[in-house]
A protein has these predicted regions:
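ATP/NTP phosphate-donor binding region
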Residues: 1-72, 83, 87
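Short Gly/Thr/Asp-enriched flexible loops that form oxyanion-binding sites at enzyme active sites
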Residues: 80-94
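Short coil/turn residues that cap or connect secondary-structure elements
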Residues: 19-23, 77, 93
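Short, solvent-exposed amphipathic alpha-helical segments in soluble enzyme
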Residues: 26-28, 90-91, 159-160
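Short beta-strand scaffold positions
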Residues: 75-76, 98
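Residue-level preference for short coil/turn positions at secondary-structure junctions
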Residues: 5, 69, 92, 137-138
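A short acidic Gly-Thr/Ser loop motif
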Residues: 77-79, 102
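Catalytic core of DAGKc-family lipid kinases
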Residues: 12, 16, 38, 47, ...
Length: 192
């Protein structure tokens, strides 16, 4: 049942995650068709850096909270993009949709969200919001895990490779080898 008033849908996408508004495959147009068929009015926001992210998310939240229909805020990117969007939306009642465009998409897989972009959009447009647990350590939130040791080094090195050589799935493997061969560090933990 479609309401007469359109519901806001803010599509927050990481320009590094492979999603483009102007794509040859027309995926953005297909997404907006799926969303508008369910009464959503889509507005896209490209994120380039963390300062811009904070500014855009403040604007997006104000728009959604001012609307009689809170709508949906969609994170289009990987787990990092999703985590940053969730951090801003955490203390609101606004649902977050996931368009999984990252390398691993752990959260989307954990929640059973289709990895196909258009199928994930259909879930966002027609599905029911589900609550999920969120962990908080200091000022950071974690949707699927928090890691110590080698894994965070792998991720940092992979992002370095992506920044230097462009975004390729192969970097997940080559950066891990680089960490194992050159970047080993001793980690001491103290528990109380």
């Amino acid at each position: 049942k479609m309401s007469n008033q359109s519901k806001p849908l803010s599509l927050i996408y990481n320009h590094n995650a492979g999603f483009r508004i102007q794509g040859p495959e027309g995926s953005y147009e297909q997404l907006t068709e799926i969303f508008s068929a369910q009464g959503y009015q889509t507005k896209a926001y490209e994120i380039n850096d963390s300062q811009q992210f904070d500014k855009i998310m403040t604007e997006v939240l104000e728009q959604h909270l001012a609307s009689s229909e809170s709508g949906i805020i969609v994170a289009a990117g990987g787990d990092g993009t999703l985590n940053t969007v969730a951090k801003h939306v955490l203390n609101t009642q606004i649902p977050v949709g996931i368009l999984p465009l990252g390398t691993f998409n752990y959260v989307a897989r954990l929640l059973g969200i289709p990895l196909d972009l258009l199928e994930a959009a259909k879930v966002i447009a027609t599905g029911q919001p589900q609550r999920m647990n969120v962990a908080r350590i200091n000022q950071e939130i974690y949707l699927n895990n928090a890691s110590l040791g080698l894994y965070p080094l792998f991720i940092k090195k992979r992002e370095d490779y992506n920044r230097i050589f462009g975004r390729l799935p192969l970097h997940a493997y080559t950066s891990a080898l680089d960490v194992l061969i050159r970047d080993r560090k001793e980690l001491k933990l103290k528990s109380w």
